[in-house]
From Swiss-Prot:
Pfam families hit by this protein: Pkinase
Entry-linked InterPro entries: Kinase-like_dom_sf, Prot_kinase_dom, Protein_kinase_ATP_BS, Ser/Thr_kinase_AS, Ser/Thr_Kinases-Pseudokinases
GO BP, one annotated term: positive regulation of MAPK cascade
Protein name listed in UniProt: Serine/threonine-protein kinase mos
Originating species: Gallus gallus (Chicken)
Function: Serine/threonine kinase involved in the regulation of MAPK signaling.
Length: 349
C-alpha cells in the first residue's frame, strides 16, 4: 500500500492571528423579502481577524444580501448574493466537528488567490473571519459570480441547462462534446494554471467539479480550499502535502507523501483532459486498490479508444495526456510549456 498521506498541524506564519486594519463585526442574518441581508452586530471577543496583508478585502456587511443557495457540502454552503449591487457568490465555511484544523486550513487556503485577477481564475472579492452568530461558521468568502455550471456538469450532463435539445438529437441524456470544445476547455484550464503557478500557487484539487463554465463557455478555476503557496524562488513547497483533494486526480508523488510542486496540478489536468475527451469516470475500482495501483503499477485511465487515434487532434491530445501524467515529476511538462501546443491546436481547428 502507498504511504498514508501525511497530515501536518500547521498554518502559514502570515496567517497567524493578527489585528485587522478595518472593523469587522459579527453579522446578524435578517430574513428579507427577496433573501437574507447581513447587518453588523456585536463583535465576538474570540473572533480572529484577517492579517494586515488581507485587510483590503474585509467585508462591508451592510452591503451584502444573500439571494438563494447554490450548493452545500462538508465545507459549508455557497449562496448567490449581491454585494454593493453586484451579483456575487458567497461561501460560508463551516467548522468541522471532526477536524477543525482542516476547516481552518481550507478557509485560509481559499485566500491564496486574494487580489489575483485572471480571466481563467475565480476572483476573491472580499473575506472575513466573522460570520452570523447563529451559524457554526469559520468565515465568509465573497467571490465573483460565474454561474452554477461546472465542467463536470458539461461532461456528464448533470445540469439541465446543458441537456436542452438532446432528446431531439437522439442522445442518451447528455450532449456530446466536440474535439474543438475539448481543446478550448483545455486551453483555458492550462492558461489559468500557468498564471497560478507563475504566482507561486498550486491548486492541488483540480478536477471538472472545480472548474466553472461562464455563460460564454470559458473555464474558470475555482475552489482553492486545498491550495498551497510555494515559497518565493522555489519550485516546490517545503511542506509535504496535507490531506484533502480527490484521490482519482491526485498525483502519485502526493499519494506517497512527497513534496508539493506545480507538476501535481499537471497530473490532475491530464486526468481532467481524459474525462473531457472520454466522458467517463477515470477509475471504477475500490479506492484503496486505485491508490495502490496508481503508485505501484502506474495505473492510468486507458488511451486505447478510437477517439484518440482517428484524428490528428485526438492523437495530439493523447500525446499531451501521456506526457502530463507520467510518474516521474521531472518528465511532465509545465503549464507554460503546454500552452504553445494547445494554442496552436486551437488555432488550427
Amino acid at each position: 500500500m502507498p504511504s498514508p498521506i501525511p497530515f501536518n498541524s500547521f498554518l502559514p506564519l502570515e496567517l497567524s492571528p493578527s489585528a485587522d486594519l478595518r472593523p469587522c463585526s459579527s453579522p446578524v442574518v435578517i430574513p428579507g423579502k427577496d433573501g437574507k441581508a447581513f447587518l453588523g452586530g456585536t463583535p465576538s471577543p474570540r473572533t480572529r481577524r484577517l492579517p494586515p496583508r488581507l485587510a483590503w478585502c474585509s467585508i462591508d456587511w451592510d452591503r451584502l444580501c444573500l439571494l438563494q443557495p447554490l450548493g452545500s457540502g462538508g465545507f459549508g454552503a455557497v449562496y448567490k448574493a449581491t454585494y454593493h449591487g453586484v451579483t456575487v457568490a458567497v461561501k460560508q465555511v463551516k467548522k468541522s466537528s471532526k477536524n477543525r484544523l482542516a476547516s481552518r486550513q481550507s478557509f485560509w487556503a481559499e485566500l491564496n488567490v486574494a487580489r489575483l485577477q485572471h480571466d481563467n481564475v475565480v476572483r476573491v472579492v472580499a473575506a472575513s473571519t466573522c460570520a452570523p452568530a447563529s451559524q457554526n461558521s469559520l468565515g465568509t468568502i465573497i467571490m465573483e459570480y460565474v454561474g452554477n455550471v461546472t465542467l463536470h456538469h458539461v461532461i456528464y450532463g448533470t445540469r439541465d441547462a446543458w441537456r436542452q435539445g438532446e432528446e431531439e438529437e437522439g442522445g442518451c441524456g447528455r450532449k456530446a462534446l466536440s474535439m474543438a470544445e475539448a481543446v478550448c476547455y483545455s486551453c483555458d484550464i492550462v492558461t489559468g494554471l500557468a498564471f497560478l503557478h507563475s504566482q507561486g500557487i498550486v491548486h492541488l484539487d483540480l478536477k471538472p467539479a472545480n472548474i466553472l463554465i461562464t455563460e460564454h463557455g470559458a473555464c474558470k478555476i475555482g475552489d482553492f480550499g486545498c491550495s498551497q503557496r510555494l515559497e518565493e524562488g522555489l519550485s516546490q513547497s517545503h511542506h509535504v502535502c496535507q490531506q484533502g483533494g480527490t484521490y482519482t486526480h491526485r498525483a502519485p508523488e502526493l499519494l506517497k507523501g512527497e513534496r508539493v510542486t506545480a507538476k501535481a496540478d499537471i497530473y490532475s489536468f491530464a486526468i481532467t483532459l481524459w474525462q473531457i475527451v472520454m466522458r467517463e469516470q477515470p477509475y471504477l475500482g475500490e479506492r484503496q486498490y486505485v491508490l495502490y495501483a496508481v503508485v505501484a503499477y502506474n495505473l492510468r485511465p486507458p488511451l486505447a479508444a478510437a477517439i484518440f487515434h482517428e484524428s490528428a487532434v485526438g492523437q495530439r491530445l493523447r500525446s499531451i495526456i501521456s506526457c502530463c501524467w507520467k510518474a516521474d515529476v521531472e518528465e511532465r511538462l509545465s503549464a507554460a510549456q503546454l500552452l504553445p501546443s494547445l494554442r496552436a491546436l486551437k488555432e488550427n481547428l
